Each structure stands twice: as structure tokens, then as C-alpha cells.
Amino acid sequence: MNNQLENVFRFDEEKERAKIRESPWKHDPEFFRSVKISAVALLKMLRHVSQGMPLEVMGYVQGKVEGASLIILDSFALPVEGTETRVNAHEEAQEYSVQYHTLCKSVYRHENVIGWYHSHPNYGCWLSGVDVETQRQNQKYQDPFVAVVLDPKRSLESPYVNIGAFRTYPVGNDGSIRTKSRHHPSVLFKNLPSSKIEDAGAHAEAYYSLPITYFHSKAEKKVTEFLRNRNWSRSITECSILQNNEFLHDSEKLIDHLIHETGNNELPVASAYEQSKACCNELSTFLSQIDVQDKLFKE
């Protein structure tokens, strides 16, 4: 790992405290110009929102500030109830977040919570009126803070991740301080369901978009290459073999049946092989996901 990349992953708690004490973003509503996301943080978010479809789900991102960039190093899901159009964090989710952050520190992961993410299944990445108010409250009390939105359905149907990162303007300054470079990308509000057009347009001046780039360590690169060479959408969305009780139960019944039939010479070995082939293929697929899902994505 080169020094520049190593520095991205290194977290200096004292330096981070100094940046927060200085808080230059309080004097410049457009202080932050970009967001950088690690590969594992992105995959964890994508896995969570994909498995949550068709409901909206949410979580937090952890990381640090580097110049005018917010660096997202990790993410974790929140146990919140969502609907097909809205998700809200309750007190239990806040308690969970505090406990999770405490446990992270106990294993020397000191990165701060620097934002939240949630999903917009099949209606793009932008901030609704509720999202804008939530983000404004977060920036008021927890800054630095960024809002990340992912569309899992569109992501799984295309070769790229449908994602956006946003920060809100202070109340009363909507759009009046925006520079030309901060306007939303034209693609942001394309192909919206008719029920979402009004909400999306009504609050577009209340926030700005931040360009997103990605980075990965050598270990993370192996994960992304693994997914690229396989059916990545299936690997992301399906439960692991350790969680698929129905598959395990059906496989156990099939194996018991084949052992009984072949043991009593009632079924030729060739026939037993043919009957078990589908099960073996499915098992092979699930086994290929264990390292990725149950080790690298384990929360």
C-alpha cells in the first residue's frame, strides 16, 4: 500500500478533534466539495439497501475530514422500521448507534460518525422534504455530516451504483449562495415516478450535491474483483448459506432421501447423482459467497 493510500485509512483522533474545534464549515455553507468512499463501506451500504427492498432502510457512515473532503471508511445499518416511501430513526436506533460506536472504540476503530445513508428504491438519489429537514438537524448538531442516498433497484439493474451525496444550506439561504459548480447533475431528477416529481423539485434549492470517488486497499480490491467476476447483484442481495434455513432444510431432506434409496439399492447411483446436481450447484454458489458475506461484510 502506498503512503498516500495508507494515509487515507489512518485515523488520527487528536487531529480530528482539532478540525472539529476549528469547524471551518460553519463559516462556509459549501466548504465540503467532495466525498470519498471506501469499497467495503460502499458494498456494506449496497448490501443493506438491496436486502431491504422494497422498503426504505437507513444506517450511518463513519470516517473523517480531510481538507474539503469527507472520507467514508465504514458504514453500519440501523435497526429501524421503514415503509416504501419513508424511514425514520427512533430512540432505539440512536441507542444502538451509541452502543455500536462504543464497541468500535473497544477494538481501536475510532472513526467518527460523519453521516447517514438511506435508500430510495427505484426513484433515484435526491433529498425529500423530510430528508432535508433531517440533514439540517444533523448538520446543526453533529457536523461534519453528509447525507448519502442509494437506489438499490436501479443499481442492481445497471453496471454502476446509483448513489448521491448531499449537504443542506442553512435555513434562509436556499440557493442564494450556490455557485455554478454546485448545481445538481442533470441526471439527478431524471426518470422520477410521477408521485415523487413534486417533492424532488420543491426542495432542490435547499441542498447541493457532492461528487463521489472511491478507493480501496489491496484486500478490498480482491473483494471487488471477486464480485466483478461473478453475479455481483446476487452475491450482494442474497442471504448467506448460514442464514438460508429453507435451503439447508431442503438439502438435508434430499441427502437423507438419497442415502436411504441408494443404501437399499432402490435407486441407481447415477440417478442419485442427477437428483443431487441442482442441490450441489446451489451449494457451490452459496459457498462462494461465504468469505465475502460472512467475513468481510459481517457487521
UniProtKB/Swiss-Prot annotation:
One of its GO terms (biological process) is protein deneddylation. Residues 35-172 form the MPN domain. Its EC number is 3.4.-.-. Pfam families: JAB. The keyword S-adenosyl-L-methionine does not apply. Gene3D superfamilies: Cytidine Deaminase, domain 2. A motif (JAMM motif) lies at residues 118-131. One of its GO terms (cellular component) is cytoplasm. Zn(2+) binds at residues 118, 120, 131. GO terms for molecular function: deNEDDylase activity; metal ion binding; metallopeptidase activity. Its main location: cytoplasm. Component of the COP9 signalosome (CSN) complex. Catalytic Component of the COP9 signalosome (CSN) complex that acts as an regulator of the ubiquitin (Ubl) conjugation pathway by mediating the deneddylation of the cullin subunit of SCF-type E3 ubiquitin-protein ligase complexes. This is COP9 signalosome complex subunit 5. It comes from Schizosaccharomyces pombe (strain 972 / ATCC 24843) (Fission yeast). The lineage of its organism: Eukaryota, Fungi, Dikarya, Ascomycota, Taphrinomycotina. The gene is csn5.
